[in-house]
Amino acid sequence: MFVFIAKLLIFSSVITSAFTCYQCFIDENDSRRLCLGHILTEYNVRNVDSCYKTLDRIFNNEEKVIEAGKVGRGYDLTLKNILMAEIMPIVEEFDQQLNYDTEYESRLQAAANNFIAAASSLPRVSGCLPPCGFQVQGAVYNCVTCQYDSCEFPLDCPGKEITVQENNRTQMWCSVPFLLPADVEIVWRYAQDRTMLRERFDDVTVGVDPLYSIPSARPEQSGTYQCEVLSQEQSLVRLYFYLTVVPVAQTYHVHLQDLCAQALRPEPQFPPSFSFWLPRPALLITCLTATMLLIFLSLGAMCRLWYQIRTNVSNPA
């Protein structure tokens, strides 16, 4: 009785410490059936603990097995089927049978090699794309933890600055570089100030449209626009747009300042390339206009003088 309890304690401790890649897919009862007939060749005695150590060495702690198990989301079931196809025939064959450790070593190593070859051909994960978002398709299966590792990025993306003149059209796209599920819901929100605090925003639209458009922007529409993407009520990513609408009067004022600055800017001093000076076009036009005006005034005065002389000759005193 004492020997049985001792074996049971050893078996329980081994099961607890061996929760890694092999235990992700193979049931504990099947592992027990596999290892109960394990015989140490050197001592010709049954040793269950040595069998589990062999499983750890060949499967659970082998880097090649762990790397082969890093598949994309949705392929963990395929991974399980591959491993069970290699292990379960050995379990059924060794169940309630005594086999030497050399036989265990040979059969389990062959099963591990076959698993590595088959699992390595499965689609790999596309990878995590920084800097933000819960990237469902980017997660990778971890044989050590028996679950998918997330990309561990924050949900909030860095804000994007947008500046537009009053009465002009502006658009904001709720787009991300990673794949999204097909059942996403997009919520657009607005806050008057520059913020990322959820309580400062008011909902604007809810639907599936990734585009938010303002046909004719007004200064009072300046502020922060938030786009949140959800799937099954779980937030996947939040994008922020900091919109600044420049009033028309301010635009004209800035334009006038630029014109004045250009007019007052001194002309660059360059050594003359010719011996005579060429006037600027604007000054030349002014001079020509003044000259033509003087000519017309002179002609007018001459005509008036000629008319007066002719009148005096025709009507002598």
Curated annotation (Swiss-Prot):
What does UniProt give as GO cellular component? acrosomal membrane
Q: Where in the cell is it found?
A: Cytoplasmic vesicle, Secretory vesicle, Acrosome membrane
The residue spans the entry assigns to the Cytoplasmic side of the membrane are as follows 303-317
Q: Which residues are glycosylated?
A: N29, N168
Give me the Extracellular side stretches, as residue ranges: 19-281
GO biological process per UniProt: fusion of sperm to egg plasma membrane involved in single fertilization; regulation of fusion of sperm to egg plasma membrane; sperm-egg recognition
Q: Where is the signal peptide?
A: 1-18
Task: Give the observed phenotype of the deletion mutant.
Answer: Leads to male infertility; mutant sperms have reduced dcst2 levels and fail to stably adhere to the egg plasma membrane.
Recorded hits in InterPro entries, A to Z, give: Ig-like_dom (IPR007110), Ig-like_dom_sf (IPR036179), Ig-like_fold (IPR013783), Ig_sub (IPR003599), SPACA6 (IPR034549)
Which tissues express it? Expressed in testis.
Residues crossing the lipid bilayer are: 282-302
As for family, the record states: Belongs to the SPACA6 family.
Could you give the subunit structure recorded for this chain?
A: Forms a complex with izumo1 and tmem81 on spermatocyte cell membrane. The complex binds to oocyte protein bncr.
Could you identify this protein by its name?
Answer: Sperm acrosome membrane-associated protein 6
Q: Species name for this entry?
A: Danio rerio
